[in-house]
């Protein structure tokens, strides 16, 4: 969940036995079992997450990445540990630690403070040529307005 230029919102939903992490960019939803079950043996694109609580911190550990989405050069050996801690009413501290001995000599950690968003999360949608279609879309809307 590295920040990008836009679409950085994250929705965190807690349900019985699960936490769901929904990112606005690409609109990916990661369903995190919280019941202590073992990791699934097969690899998957986003890895296999498992979560637990350490005091007031949500900890999500993901393994079993299939290598289709390499993170900074990592591959199938990637072990990702994410920590979510509420530090104030409007701030969530997000820390992630990346381990992959085939790429790095030691694990490394990043800390990002996430602020509460008062706005809505929008569907991530794009299409080819959208920079050229805006004038046509607006022109069509103005035509309809004039001819009502």
Label each residue range with its predicted role.
Residues 1-148:
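PEST-like low-complexity, intrinsically disordered acidic/proline/serine-rich tracts
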């Amino acid at each position: 969940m590295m920040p990008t230029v836009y679409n950085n919102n994250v929705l965190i939903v807690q349900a019985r036995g699960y936490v769901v992490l929904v990112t606005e960019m690409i609109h990916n939803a990661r369903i995190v079992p919280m019941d202590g079950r073992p990791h699934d043996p097969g690899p998957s694109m986003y890895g296999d997450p498992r979560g637990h609580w350490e005091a007031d911190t949500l900890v999500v550990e993901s393994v079993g990445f299939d290598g289709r989405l390499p993170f900074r050069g990592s591959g199938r050996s990637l072990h990702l540990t994410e920590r979510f801690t509420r530090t104030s009413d409007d701030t969530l501290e997000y820390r992630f630690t990346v381990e992959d001995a085939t790429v790095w000599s030691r694990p490394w950690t990043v800390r990002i403070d996430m602020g509460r968003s008062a706005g809505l999360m929008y569907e991530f949608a794009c299409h080819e040529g959208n920079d050229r279609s805006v004038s046509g879309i607006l022109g069509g809307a103005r035509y309809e307005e004039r001819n009502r």
